Amino acid sequence: MTIISFREWMKQYDLGTTVKETPIPIETIEAIESAKLVVTSDQRRAVQSAAELLDSLSFVQNPLFREAEVPTSFYAPKWLKCKPNVWMFIGRTRWIVGYSKEVESYKEVRERARQAANILHRYALVHGHIALVGHSYFNAMIGTELRAMGWYGSPIFHRKPWGCITYTFHEAMDGNVLNTKLI
């Protein structure tokens, strides 16, 4: 697809609905079932995923957890055709090095990830086990911030739908173990 087709594809992707093409892994189901609080962004796909996982709408939606957008307003020759994942890579790479036309800058998204990690930390202090149903790239950024705050969890994120990573925080003062699941 050309860059123009990719721009349209991204718009349609954002407006689309989730399709359960792959079964939900048991670890993800267990993470949701053990959570005392489930949080998601307000983006359509995340809300649909949370509703599918919970079979209800009993979760907190917060725009702070929205995915980091990929810039698509960059020049590419009209004859150049790439697969969507290649255009995503090009857009994401340009974004990381400073190109952010029409989207939040990398620096702004990193700050938002820091804020999101702080909110998740506070939710975990209150509720113990929590789950975030979110978006792969932004979840990875939140994971980086959680690890910087002393949480333990894998720096490797699942690229497949319905993947789950568990972060654990051992509170030294009273021996509490808090868990956050990023899905």
Can you name each region flagged by the protein language model?
Residues 50-52, 143-146:
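Short amphipathic alpha-helical segments
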Residues 66-81:
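Short alpha-helix plus adjacent loop in nuclease-associated cores
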Residues 46-47, 138-140:
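Short, active-site-adjacent cap segments at secondary-structure transitions
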Residues 4-7, 147-175:
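Domain-level recognition of soluble alpha/beta enzyme cores
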Residues 31-33, 120-128:
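Glycine-rich phosphate-binding loop signature in dinucleotide/nucleotide-binding domains
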Residues 39-40, 124, 128-137:
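Beta-strand elements within well-structured catalytic alpha/beta cores of enzymes
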